From Swiss-Prot:
One of its GO terms (molecular function) is DNA-binding transcription factor activity. Transcription factor. Interacts specifically with the W box (5'-(T)TGAC[CT]-3'), a frequently occurring elicitor-responsive cis-acting element. It comes from Arabidopsis thaliana (Mouse-ear cress). The lineage of its organism: Eukaryota, Viridiplantae, Streptophyta, Embryophyta, Tracheophyta. The gene is WRKY65. This is Probable WRKY transcription factor 65. Residues 1-17, 47-69 have a biased composition (Basic and acidic residues).
Length: 259
């Protein structure tokens, strides 16, 4: 009996040794290649991506549709919002933005309000931009040159004096050509002829012949008839401005001039 049991055990040990024998060369080569690939392959996980957190004072968004939604502060990049979701333990949602300055840029950021200080905004940047820094509006437009001041036009001097002279000239011409004025001053033109006749009359010629001293005054009396007195009886005294007046009598036929 004992001999049979020993033979059975030895048989089982032989089979187990064959099963657990040395590995074949094919299996060892396969395991080595698998370990090499696993050592050189990068770990693609979200935790390996570098993140940068920035605290910025909050700016309330005017006309916000969602309660607690905030507008991220400007950082010279163009961003486009593509999602939003609530956060556990916080009354404020989290917004997700991607860079829209250049197509295909991997830069992302998350914007949310701080739980501890609601007046602050937490901005988490992930990835980096693959394009140069965008130009600001001031550098893009450039300083505009100031417009040069336009010279003020000099005021034109109106020829007022010449116009007034022309007015007086026109008025003078009108007076000369008016027939009523011609009749009114006709006596002044006849004064030369009458004065010349008076000087040539025999009365004044006889006075030259008589010798009179320089100190004595010479008085000339002209005879005046009754008819002449009756003609001038109804007339009043002439004003002082009258220098010359003239009287003609058809009966006597004499002409008297008084200066």
């Amino acid at each position: 009996m004992k001999r049979g049991l020993d033979m059975a055990r030895s048989y089982n040990d032989h089979e187990s040794s064959q099963e657990t024998g040395p590995e074949s060369p094919n299996s060892s080569t396969f395991n080595g290649m698998k370990a090499l690939i696993s050592s050189h392959s990068p770990k693609r996980s979200r935790r390996s991506v570098e993140k940068r957190v920035v605290n910025v004072p909050m700016k309330e968004m005017e006309g916000s549709r969602h309660k607690g939604d905030t507008t991220p502060p400007s950082d010279s990049w163009a961003w486009r919002k593509y999602g939003q979701k609530p956060i556990k333990g916080s009354p404020y949602p989290r917004g997700y933005y991607r860079c829209s300055s250049t197509k295909g840029c991997p830069a992302r950021k998350q914007v949310e309000r701080s739980r501890d200080d609601p007046t602050m905004i937490l901005i988490t940047y992930t990835s980096e931009h693959n394009h140069p820094w965008p130009l600001t509006s001031s550098t893009r437009n450039g300083p505009k040159p100031k417009p040069e001041p336009k010279p003020e036009p000099e005021p034109e001097v109106e020829p007022e004096a010449e116009e007034e002279d022309n007015k007086f000239m026109v008025l003078g011409r009108g007076i000369e050509t008016t027939p009523s004025c011609v009749d009114e001053f006709a006596w002044f033109t006849e004064m030369e002829t009458t004065s010349s006749t008076i000087l040539e009359s025999p009365i004044f010629s006889s006075e030259k012949k008589t010798a009179v001293s320089g100190a004595d005054d010479v008085a000339v009396f002209f005879p005046m008839g009754e008819e002449d007195e009756s003609l001038f009886a109804d007339l009043g005294e002439l004003p002082e401005c009258s220098v010359v007046f003239r009287h003609r009598s058809s009966v006597v036929g004499s002409q008297v001039e008084i200066f």
